[in-house]
Structures are given as C-alpha cells and as structure tokens.
C-alpha cells in the first residue's frame, strides 16, 4: 500500500533521504510472482502459456521455475490461464520459494511442514523431489 504523500517528507526529515526512499519503495505494491509446478509443466511450458496470453514476465536467474509478471498484470488474467486451472503454475512470492530450495528435498525424504497454509512451500518440495518426498 502506498504511503500518503504528506508522510514522505516526514520520513526524509526523520531518517534522511536514502533510508526514506528505501522505506517508501518497500511500501509500494510488489509485482506478482509465480512458479512452474515441475510435476505438471516445465518452465518453458509456462513461458509459452504466458506469451500466448500476452502476459509480460521476467525470468529469475537463481530459480528457473520462477517468473516475475509485468506490473500491469491482473490476477484474473493469471486465474484464466489453462495451466493455472490445471495446477501447473502456482502463485507464490520469491521469498517463499527460497526455503524449499535451501532444504533441497530428495526422494524418500520425510517432511513435516507445520506451517503449511496454503501449502506453496510443501508443493514446491514435492516438485523438487520429483514427487517422491513424503
């Protein structure tokens, strides 16, 4: 949520221009991000689907399954995608994609995700293990 205009000069006065700008930037709307569900689609499948729908995106260097959508993308446009309806792509923040990558789940690993709601990291761990984690 953007900060009210009158608040920005107060931040500058209190914290200085550099930190104030970082605070203001942190309050701006974030772009929508999603990941390919590797059990149902490749990143190339997702890219082709987004291209066909005219949805702009950027790829993420550190995770090939991740996509950052163009700022003008509406969620309803994503919800209407065939791959979304099939569960082949998942709306998930980039920061939420990091823990499963750090864990590196392997086939046969038993995982108890005690914070699973709505389950994005859990489904990502399942995909990273090739559908063979428990």
Region locations from a protein language model:
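S-adenosylmethionine
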Residues: 1-134
């Amino acid at each position: 949520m953007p900060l009210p205009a009158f608040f920005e000069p107060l931040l500058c006065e209190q914290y200085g221009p550099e930190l104030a700008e970082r605070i203001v930037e942190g309050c701006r709307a974030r772009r929508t991000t999603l990941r390919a569900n590797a059990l149902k689609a490749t990143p190339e499948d997702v890219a082709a689907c987004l291209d066909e729908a005219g949805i702009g995106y950027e790829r993420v260097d550190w995770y090939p399954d991740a996509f950052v959508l163009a700022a003008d993308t509406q969620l309803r446009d994503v919800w209407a995608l065939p791959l979304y309806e099939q569960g082949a792509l998942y709306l998930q923040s980039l920061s939420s994609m990091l823990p499963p990558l750090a864990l590196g789940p392997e086939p046969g690993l038993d995982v108890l995700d005690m914070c699973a709601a709505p389950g994005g990291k859990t489904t990502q761990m399942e995909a990273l293990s090739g559908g063979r984690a428990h």
